[in-house]
Amino acid sequence: MQLNKVLKGLMIALPVMAIAACSSNKNASNDGSEGMLGAGTGMDANGGNGNMSSEEQARLQMQQLQQNNIVYFDLDKYDIRSDFAQMLDAHANFLRSNPSYKVTVEGHADERGTPEYNISLGERRANAVKMYLQGKGVSADQISIVSYGKEKPAVLGHDEAAYSKNRRAVLVY
């Protein structure tokens, strides 16, 4: 009889304790730490990355460069336009500062022209970017090129807006 009373008491108390343990107190996390994930990493007041290793800094910088890694070309052209110089200079600075990193320059063309012509044009575009980077001091061993011609369009379409987005070279780390 005594054992039944104890068991009944436990059967009521255990679920109540489990529910109480699972509930959260909304005021408990009011110490200001919520939403501070990553606080301590990132830029310090001097513009440097406070407690990041040089490898982490290089990886972060590379990720930022990958946001701006496309050089566009005019129709049937492969010369680097002046509006892409600053972007390519940033890539060159990164590669010079990080000789262990390598980049592949992918050359592309729009769908007009024969496959052979477009492969050749894509190669000349990729090579133009490679030569620009080498002219800024990047080692030739860090740069490889490939041409896809018209085989990998960035934009599908048969108008000048699509064509202009497909005439490009892409820097891929």
Curated annotation (Swiss-Prot):
A lipid is attached at residue 22 (S-diacylglycerol cysteine). Residues 60-173 form the OmpA-like domain. SUPFAM superfamilies: OmpA-like. It holds the Pfam family OmpA. GO terms for cellular component: cell division site; cell outer membrane; membrane. Residues 30-58 are annotated as: Disordered. Residues 35-50 have a biased composition (Gly residues). Part of the Tol-Pal system, which plays a role in outer membrane invagination during cell division and is important for maintaining outer membrane integrity. The Tol-Pal system is also required for polar localization of chemoreceptors clusters. The system also appears to be required for the activity of several outer membrane-localized enzymes with cell wall remodeling activity. A lipid is attached at residue 22 (N-palmitoyl cysteine). It comes from Escherichia coli (strain K12). The gene is pal. It comes from the Bacteria. Its main location: membrane. It is found in: Cell outer membrane. Keywords: Cell cycle, Cell division, Cell outer membrane, Lipoprotein, Membrane, Palmitate, Signal. Belongs to the Pal lipoprotein family. The Tol-Pal system is composed of five core proteins: the inner membrane proteins TolA, TolQ and TolR, the periplasmic protein TolB and the outer membrane protein Pal. They form a network linking the inner and outer membranes and the peptidoglycan layer. Pal interacts with TolB. Interacts with the C-terminal domain of TolA. This interaction is proton motive force dependent and requires TolQ and TolR. Can form a complex with TolB and OmpA. Residues 1-21 form the signal peptide. Disruption phenotype: Mutants lacking the tol-pal cluster suffer delayed outer membrane invagination and contain large outer membrane blebs at constriction sites and cell poles. Tol-pal mutants fail to complete division and form cell chains, and fail to process denuded peptidoglycans at the septum. GO terms for biological process: cell division; cell septum assembly; regulation of membrane invagination. This is Peptidoglycan-associated lipoprotein. HAMAP family: Pal (MF_02204).
